[in-house]
């Protein structure tokens, strides 16, 4: 299997591999079988995605595009191929020199199956309801300390706690998560 300039990978429960990368001014997500045979490559003009995650329950794949400030949703077809479904583009900026525009850095599921994104450029977390078809509805936004630059979020496996890594001020926020 080959993906030019890969930056992040994720696996489905079936063992398919999804990789984000870029080639010749286009970025996207490539899909591969469990034995690493190429299935398809969904690309778009401009900067590549920086994060990919798989929602096996709804048969969706989520991507974060740092340079465009976007979260993207792809449908997982029965053979593992991807097709584009929906996207949301964040708005705003932050006080740090690296925060002139939105920079979506992470897109993954909460323990109760909502999609959450970290936006380094706007110092915010966005929470979305995701329909079975992959359509996004923004339902909440949480502001982090100005200039923090949220990058990645990890939920504790047993407690109602999430750990947020902030890149720009080199901190970790410990958040209480009681669901939506």
Describe these PLM feature segments.
Residues 1, 34-40, 78-86, 133-140, ...:
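Beta-strand initiation motifs
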Residues 1, 18-36:
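Beta-propeller domains
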Residues 3-13, 45-57, 92-113, 144-162:
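Beta-rich, blade/repeat-based domains predominating
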Residues 19-23, 63-66, 117-120, 164-167:
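Conserved beta-strand positions in repeat-built beta-propeller and related beta-rich domains
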Residues 25-29, 69-72, 123-125, 170-172:
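Structural signal for beta-propeller blades
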Residues 32-33, 74-75, 129, 175-176:
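Structural recognition of the beta-propeller blade-terminating site
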Residues 38-106:
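Asp-box/WD-like beta-propeller blade repeats and closely related beta-sheet repeat scaffolds
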Residues 115-170:
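Loop-centered beta-sheet repeat module
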């Amino acid at each position: 299997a080959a993906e030019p300039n890969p930056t992040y990978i994720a696996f489905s429960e079936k063992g398919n591999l999804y990789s984000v990368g870029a080639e010749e001014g286009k970025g996207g997500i490539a899909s591969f079988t469990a034995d690493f045979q190429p299935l398809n490559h969904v690309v778009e003009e401009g900067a590549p995605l920086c994060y990919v995650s798989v929602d096996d329950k709804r048969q969706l794949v989520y991507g974060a595009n740092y340079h465009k400030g976007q979260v993207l949703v792809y449908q997982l077809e029965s053979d593992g191929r991807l097709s584009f479904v929906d996207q949301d583009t964040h708005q705003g900026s932050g006080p740090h020199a690296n925060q002139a525009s939105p920079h979506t850095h992470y897109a993954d599921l909460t323990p109760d199956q909502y999609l959450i994104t970290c936006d380094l450029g706007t110092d915010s977390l966005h929470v979305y309801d995701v329909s079975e078809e992959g359509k996004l509805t923004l339902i909440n936004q949480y502001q982090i300390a100005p200039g923090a630059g949220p990058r990645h979020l990890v939920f504790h496996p047993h407690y109602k706690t999430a750990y947020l890594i902030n890149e720009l001020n080199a901190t970790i926020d410990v958040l209480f998560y009681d669901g939506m």
